[in-house]
């Protein structure tokens, strides 16, 4: 079904209302729309929902979904981060207890957190260009290949983890790690190690 399912209303770092997303999807001629604000995580993160905001989001989105029932498909989901057990030991238990315990129509499963920053906190690969440069230099000792290989190794783990979620999933931004590689600043994407 031709639709848009990776959308962030203003409950996390996104903007706009669920109703505005529905109207925009209809205007674009899409057959359906899904909303998928960033799910809460068990540590401080500026761009995910808090638990309280998550409950508000689901309730508000269900109201909009009900309003459109029978006339336009609206799916209520989240963008759910893969939280590697070595990085966030309580991540899976937190998600089961607080996010996956809520009835959702689907999830966009994504990888943002790769390793720790210099202060020991989970580090998001897409935080900023400056953060990425610092992570490459400080945490990876200038070895961007190692960071990229860590990212794709974790993507393999994400694929296995997602199969057990018991809701439909869409994999989000498979190649997020190259977001800051504009002009091949860090590596050549044609290199054999990257292509493999």
What are these regions (language model features)?
Residues 11-13, 104, 109-196:
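Domain-core and long-helix interface of multi-subunit machines
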């Amino acid at each position: 079904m031709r639709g848009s399912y990776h959308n962030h209303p203003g409950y996390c770092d996104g903007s706009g209302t669920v109703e505005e997303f529905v109207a925009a999807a209809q205007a674009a001629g899409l057959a359906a729309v899904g909303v998928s604000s960033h799910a809460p995580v068990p540590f401080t993160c500026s761009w995910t929902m808090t638990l309280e905001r998550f409950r508000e989001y689901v309730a508000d989105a269900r109201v909009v979904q009900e309003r459109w029932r029978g006339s336009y498909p609206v799916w209520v989901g989240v963008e759910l981060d893969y939280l590697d057990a070595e990085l966030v030991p309580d991540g899976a238990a937190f998600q089961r207890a607080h996010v996956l315990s809520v009835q959702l129509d689907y999830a966009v499963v994504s990888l943002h957190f790769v390793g720790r920053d210099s202060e020991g906190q989970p580090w998001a690969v897409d935080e900023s260009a400056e953060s990425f440069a610092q992570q490459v230099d400080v945490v990876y000792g200038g070895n961007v290949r190692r960071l990229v290989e860590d990212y794709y190794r974790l993507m393999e783990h994400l694929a296995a983890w997602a199969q057990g979620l018991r809701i439909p999933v869409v994999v989000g931004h498979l190649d997020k790690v190259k977001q800051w590689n504009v002009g091949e600043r860090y590596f050549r994407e044609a290199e054999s190690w990257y292509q493999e």
